[in-house]
Amino acid sequence: MNAEAPSPIQLPAFTLLDEPALAFASGDPKAMHRHPLIGLSRFGAFDQASFRHYVSELRVAYVGPRSGAAQVRDMRESLRGPQRNTDRNSYAQAYPGFETLFGVDLLGADKQVHVVWPEELCDLGQGEKVADRIRSALHHALKRLETVRDQFDVALVYFPDRWLPHLRTKEFDAHDELKALGAQLGIPTQVLNDKSLRFDNRGARAWRLAVALYAKSGGTPWKLAPIGGVPDATAYIGLAYVIRRWLDEAHHAPCS
């Protein structure tokens, strides 16, 4: 008599997981919360105690045309104090101020550190094509910042809206160019544009930029708290996606 063939193993289509807790304030086992902004406000950053030993104040360099310097400075100053969050969703939280969150002040770097560009792309960098000029200006700016690397922690790079048609084309992407060069030279950068400078909800803007600046300066705002039954050396890879609907067609945008 023939034995029956084994049934094929079928995995479930999906599994629902509980929202994991995040760990803050290293050394305090009770410093955990599922909400990153509440956790930061209540306990402080995960590495706040050690971060202050090698970064007493977080210094920001500016790269961009002269016309944007004052706006970027004002935006940076707004991160230092409390800001009201006008979003009405459950995630939104009032922003308490940079030093309150991270234990270090947020200041502009010394004047000689900043890199000021001309107002027009035709006067920027070197090369026949606009993309070559932008690439040249980015390379010159970051190479100059490399010579004063001990005088700043992160660079804010401002691209005005009037430059946008030339910053991203089929053959060229200024953002990618900047990030690749910054990675090579060990210079963390945060890109700003007019939309971010004009953003009405200052609380939401402050949260996003403050966490980004802290992390890009070498800090760890939070980390995944230990999960029961999972080895400590386990690595996690997050995968998220959004479905954008346009003309009744679904478009998927994944991000890892």
Language model: regions and residue ranges:
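Long, low-complexity, intrinsically disordered terminal regions
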Residues: 1-256
